[in-house]
Amino acid sequence: MASIKPSPHLGQGPRVALRHLHRRDYAEIAALTRESAELHRPWLGVQEPTVEAFEPRLERFGRPAHEGFVICLRESGAIVGGVNVNDILRGSRQCGTLGFTAYAATTGRGYLTEGLGLVIRYAFGPLGLHRLEANIQPGNTRSLSLVQRLGFRCEGFSPAFQVIDGEWRDHERWALVSGNVRPTVPEGGAAGRR
């Protein structure tokens, strides 16, 4: 009897799968980032995707307070989005801060919504978190709509929250608590299922 290899995916939905970011993803992510420069510029500033910038990112995701994921198409494995859970706090807090990126070639197809649903399930399941926060600039209507669809609630406004492209930018703080999750992925696509 042949042994069944475990899936490299942390979760699968109908169209996308979730897995950890790997060093081998650099070339594909660099190309996607370059192609998406105009999409990202207003919210992330100018970011040249160099190996020198990618390596520290991988190192950061190797630490307990950070998780880095890619959302990829189930059929081809092509990367369609990136997600980070940063600043993970344990103890009495059990929370993390969510960051996410779509790529120009695949925006508007619902891949990021499906993939973030998998990340949320993974964060509130195997990661053991109770709360996720997302800090989003007020003019970033696509990201604001996305977190609203996923059930996040606006909890406040943070003036001059983060430096982007040399200037302090305001952000809205959105949060989701584990008991308030909206189903965005059919149960058959549960995170961690093999």
Name each model feature, range by range.
Residues 58-70:
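A short helix-loop-beta-strand connector motif used in the catalytic cores of GNAT acetyltransferases and
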